[in-house]
Design a protein with these regions (language model features):
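Flexible glycine/proline-rich
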Residues: 2-149
């Protein structure tokens, strides 16, 4: 950071997957810098939830909104972490949306990422999420017709 004269805005945040992440700006310049983690799912999550919204913002594109779905199965996590969870979105015949938390949530596990079709957001401050609880969800990049890659 010192060598390249960066102003450190944040380094490491309390999320999983996604450690470590860095966002900085070059001092006296209008250039930004993201440092993404090495594990594939951590990198994908950080790009999706930090880099992509940043790019939309500097381009003046309206930020996206999450959509809501009910949790199909109970989920537990550490209370102090926000978790971006690889999930499967399911639509019932009556049109209700449910998410199923997939097994294999470790940041090096790609199979569950390939099987997923939605990111579920489990916010910090709570450790247990009950069946049928309403959860914020985000479509993976490339699936949203209102935004571009």
């Amino acid at each position: 950071i010192k060598k390249f004269k960066l102003s450190n805005y944040f380094k490491n945040v309390a999320i999983r997957p996604g450690k470590p992440i860095l966002f900085a700006k070059f001092k006296n310049k209008e250039k930004s810098f993201f440092g993404l983690p090495g594990n594939p799912i951590s990198s994908a999550a950080c790009f999706r939830f930090f880099v992509y919204p940043y790019l939309l913002n500097i381009l003046g594109v309206k930020s996206e909104k999450s959509f809501k779905a009910r949790l199909k199965n109970k989920f537990e996590k550490k209370k102090n972490l926000t978790r971006f969870i690889k999930s499967k979105l399911i639509t019932t015949k009556s049109g209700n949306l449910y998410i199923e938390v997939l097994t294999g949530q470790e940041s090096f596990r790609i199979k569950s990422f390939v099987k997923s079709n939605v990111w579920s957001l489990f916010k910090a401050g709570k450790s247990t999420f009950k069946k049928n609880e309403i959860i914020d969800c985000y479509i993976p990049l490339g699936w949203d017709k209102n935004h571009f890659l």
